[in-house]
Amino acid sequence: MKFTTYTTFPEQTSNESLWILVDSEQLQSNLNTYQINNLESILTATQFKANFNETLPLFGQLSTQPHSQLLGLGKAAELQAAKLAKLAQTIIKSAQNKFKHIAIDIAALPVEYHYLFALSLTQAAYGYDEFKSTKNEFVLQQVDLISSQTSLDENQLALVHAVQSGQSYARDLGNRPGNICFPEYLAEQALALAAEFPDLLKVTVLNEQQMADLGMYAFLAVSKGSERPGRIVTLEYQAQLEQAPVVLVGKGVTFDTGGISLKPGLGMDEMKFDMCGAASVLGTIRALCEARLPIHVVGAIAAAENMPSGKATRPGDIVTTMSGQTVEILNTDAEGRLVLCDTLTYIKRFNPAVVIDIATLTGACVVALGKVLSGLFSPDDTLAAELQQAGEQSFDRVWRMPVIDDYQELLDSPFADIANIGGPHGGAITAACFLERFTRDYRWAHLDVAGTAWLSGSAKGATGRPVPLLMQFLANRVSTNG
């Protein structure tokens, strides 16, 4: 979906439908620029008050655009960012199967929300029908945004288009089933991205023999139970090689049965989403390539499948990580931290400026924060603040959680340097504390997206989060560093 901005309604246009956002406090003044026939009688007859998400079709009363509607904002001055998605869904649901080209007058919308509203439109327009015999009839391609004043300059529009591309790509990857999207498939996707952007991307793929040569036995303890071999994939975005890179590390467990510590059968199908951290890294790299931001970034994907078999790791097994630390694996369903710890050690070779790992790591984080906020863990106050700011700007929000030494003793093992679980309490925190032991040589943050990477129920599917957050974070660094 492509966006164009205008200061007034264009006289020469191919748009087929017009939506006018209206403030309940300034209903008449919002409509002064349009010659709407019988406006007073229409408002009186319908009792339209421009309450939030209230719609009023004009049924040909606007001569310049016969297919036009009003959409209420309520009191625009009190509008919250959380409501933008609902407005976007109302417009997209009405338009996307009918019109190729629509216009939306956003003059009544607070200027600071213009970027988020455009982004919300792209998110609402996403549909996944790859394996459906009958495809979705989505025809909407072009949206004109009209406002005499807007924050959507050329750079902001480019960022919207890039995030749309990357987030949709991440959602597609997340929605694909485990029999299609397995570790080698993720590696193939990375190589395909490099072929699409050969001037920007360098991709390296490690196989299991190479991992063994590097001593990555925590990672291999997860992948050994599956017939699908694991892969570690790095994608280097080479726009500014003289900079120390931002490294993004994604958990890519393409299907998680729990291994020998088998998960319950109910809802296990959703464990195809356990690679959404990796999907978000691939999506962010795609968005970077689309936006061509001048920044050095490395994406790393820890791709494995966690399956039970005669070769699978047993509870109580002890392995040596690439860092040299030993781990007692008390629960094979705490596998994400095992593939991540070796990957977090491996990426030290890039001499990173900062490292952010993204993982659907713990159910405990879902219990703590639900499906609204991602968990943010970092011992670095400055880095944490930058991520929180980017989350607010992109409305891909996070909540900072503790990662402090007080919790480390919960990971003590009588037989190894560390256990891979820390008992029944504070599970999201002890998981982050486990990872922290492998990240002490660089600035690091951990995003637990177990609650935000996908939705269940009628809206079931991958969300593509936190691609908007990560892209905003990177764009902010470009702006700050020039």
Curated annotation (Swiss-Prot):
Pfam families: Peptidase_M17, Peptidase_M17_N. GO terms for cellular component: cytoplasm. Mn(2+) 1 binds at D256, D333, E335. Binds 2 manganese ions per subunit. GO terms for biological process: proteolysis. Keywords: Aminopeptidase, Cytoplasm, Hydrolase, Manganese, Metal-binding, Protease. Disulfide bonds: none annotated. InterPro entries: Leucine_aapep/pepB, Macro_dom-like, Peptidase_M17_C, Peptidase_M17_leu_NH2_pept, Peptidase_M17_N. Its EC number is 3.4.11.1, 3.4.11.10. Gene3D superfamilies: Leucine Aminopeptidase, subunit E, domain 1 (3.40.220.10), Zn peptidases (3.40.630.10). It comes from the Bacteria. It is found in: Cytoplasm. One of its GO terms (molecular function) is metalloaminopeptidase activity. Its main location: cytoplasm. Its cofactor is Mn(2+). The active site is at K263, R337. Mn(2+) 2 binds at K251, D256, D274, E335. It catalyses: Release of an N-terminal amino acid, Xaa-|-Yaa-, in which Xaa is preferably Leu, but may be other amino acids including Pro although not Arg or Lys, and Yaa may be Pro. Amino acid amides and methyl esters are also readily hydrolyzed, but rates on arylamides are exceedingly low; Release of an N-terminal amino acid, preferentially leucine, but not glutamic or aspartic acids. PANTHER family: CYTOSOL AMINOPEPTIDASE, LEUCINE AMINOPEPTIDASE-RELATED. Belongs to the peptidase M17 family. Presumably involved in the processing and regular turnover of intracellular proteins. Catalyzes the removal of unsubstituted N-terminal amino acids from various peptides. This is Probable cytosol aminopeptidase.
